Design a protein with these regions (language model features):
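His/Asp/Glu-rich mid-to-C-terminal helical/loop segments that flank catalytic regions of hydrolases
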Residues: 285-334
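Short, low-complexity, disordered segments immediately C-terminal to signal peptides
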Residues: 16-35
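Alpha-helical metal-binding/catalytic segments enriched in His/Glu/Asp
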Residues: 122, 134, 138-191, 309
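Second-shell loop/turn segments in exported
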Residues: 47-55, 71-81, 108-111, 145-155, ...
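Metal-dependent peptidase/peptidase-like ectodomains
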Residues: 174, 184-283, 298
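Extracytoplasmic/secreted proteins, especially bacterial periplasmic and envelope-associated proteins
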Residues: 56, 60-63, 67, 81-93, ...
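A non-catalytic alpha/beta surface segment that caps or lines the substrate-entry region
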Residues: 76-125
Length: 334
């Protein structure tokens, strides 16, 4: 209707009086809806290293194990993003605790069967001039098999325990002896990291001065019911009476002291005569299986086991017993 009126007016107008007709404004085509792809799941965040709370806090232990055994880290096999992220977490934590790097940095690189990786090593220098050159090692391997094998108990639990022990030592009085905290790569490939470190010790940490090795490997098995083996702590060794005394303070766990072990990172230094205590819980169902996940571990028992290991570390670092003479006499007891 409106179009017909406009045409009639245009026909009646003179040349000088023609009505100016504006073109019709074009109608914009409809904008197609924007399809937004769902956001990818957030990557796990490295737990903050700034905490001054209790070192054996259950929530912190669980947070660290959950992170280390996350699907994103995929089992922390050597030369993977999970391996590199794990080493960064450990090195950052050592840095925040004020540990001295064993080399130019905390990471000491080595080749794991053609795969570049690293051990992560920091230490607290002893405070007593008479025994400061003697060394207590606390070790745990940080790698696992990868490819869907997440390694919560083996050995995210040991790494979480080692970091807790390092915090406990740092929060206490300076130890008389030097305490080294070392996490190893390539353990699942044949203890490659610990053998490399034993063959190439940092200049500041000679093997001849190591008087005790404390190893944390698989300390969180959910069905161990509070049982932990403390292998290597034979009756004649200096660690045994100290461990027995500590164990009585933790009635909720059963510390099975004594016995010999094989197949973990204490082995290279044991072959050089260094005594060891190897904390371990059995895990027959999920050992090296995909069911070794963070949701099935016993964090309360893990906290107690880590606390026993921490107390042993501190007592061994401060004991008046002649640990160098004990090593010379008994070696690692095998």
């Amino acid at each position: 209707m409106r179009t017909m009126v406009l045409l009639g007016l245009a026909a009646c107008a003179t040349a000088d009086q023609r009505e100016e007709v504006h073109p019709t404004t074009p109608v914009a085509a409809p904008i197609p809806p924007v399809i937004v792809a769902p956001a990818p799941p957030p990557k796990p965040v490295i737990p903050s290293c700034v905490d001054d709370g209790k070192p054996y806090d259950l929530a912190v232990l669980k947070e660290r194990v959950t992170f280390l055994a996350s699907k994103e880290l995929d089992g922390r096999a050597p030369d993977t993003d999970g391996d590199r992220t794990t080493r960064k977490l450990i090195a950052d934590r050592f840095r925040c605790l004020g540990l001295t790097p064993a080399g130019s940095d905390y990471e000491l690189p080595f080749d794991a069967g053609g795969k570049p990786t690293a051990n992560v090593v920091g230490y607290i220098k002893g405070s007593d001039p008479d025994v400061a050159d003697q060394i207590i090692y606390v070790g745990a391997h940080h790698d696992h098999e990868g490819k869907g094998h997440l390694g919560a108990n083996d050995n995210a639990s040991g790494i979480a325990g080692l970091l807790a022990v390092a915090q406990a030592v740092r929060q206490g009085e300076p130890p008389k002896r030097t305490i080294v905290f070392a996490t190893f790569g390539g353990e699942e490939l044949g203890m490659l990291g610990s053998y490399h470190l034993a063959a190439h010790p940092p200049e500041a940490l000679p093997n001849a001065k190591v008087v005790q090795f404390i190893n944390l490997d698989m300390i969180g098995t959910h069905n161990a019911r509070g049982f932990v083996a403390a292998m290597g702590s034979l009756p004649k060794l200096a660690s045994r009476p100290i461990l027995d005394k500590i164990a009585r303070k933790f009635p909720k766990i059963s510390v099975a002291a004594g016995g010999r072990a094989r197949g973990s990172d204490y082995e290279p230094l044991c072959k050089q005569g260094v005594p060891y205590v190897f904390f371990w819980t059995p895990d027959p169902k999920c050992y090296h299986e995909t069911c070794d996940t963070a949701d099935r571990l016993d964090y309360r028992a893990m906290a107690d086991i880590a606390a026993v290991a921490g107390a042993l570390t501190i007592e061994m670092a401060n004991t008046d017993r002649d640990l160098a003479a004990a090593r010379a006499k008994y070696g690692c007891g095998v």
